[in-house]
Amino acid sequence: MKAEIHPDYHNITVVMTDGTEYVTRSTWGKEGDKMNLDIDPKSHPAWTGGTQQMLDRGGRVSRFQKKFSGFLK
């Protein structure tokens, strides 16, 4: 491997939506930073059976629904 081309790999703290924290290694951020998740396996509709409502970030979900609204009719 070439030296000095890979990003720094360090410990960060990941905070789940329910407040649970765990430490993992990542290239994201700096040593000791906290990554707060908006969606995780405990709240994502794909893993919860769709009981949670999806957040529409920047109108992407509504644009998708509008574009494909008549697809299965």
From Swiss-Prot:
Domain of life: Bacteria
Annotated GO MF terms: rRNA binding; structural constituent of ribosome
InterPro entries for this protein: Ribosomal_bL28/bL31-like_sf (IPR034704), Ribosomal_bL31 (IPR002150), Ribosomal_bL31_A (IPR027491), Ribosomal_bL31_sf (IPR042105)
PROSITE patterns in the record: RIBOSOMAL_L31
GO-annotated cellular components: ribonucleoprotein complex; ribosome
Keywords assigned: Ribonucleoprotein, Ribosomal protein, RNA-binding, rRNA-binding
UniProt keyword rRNA-binding present: yes
GO biological process: translation
Residue spans of biased composition, Basic and acidic residues class: 34-43
Region feature (Disordered): 34-54
NCBIfam families, per database record: L31 (TIGR00105), PRK00528.1 (NF001809)
Function per UniProt: Binds the 23S rRNA.
HAMAP family: Ribosomal_bL31_1
Assembly and binders: Part of the 50S ribosomal subunit.
Homology family: Belongs to the bacterial ribosomal protein bL31 family. Type A subfamily.
Protein name: Large ribosomal subunit protein bL31
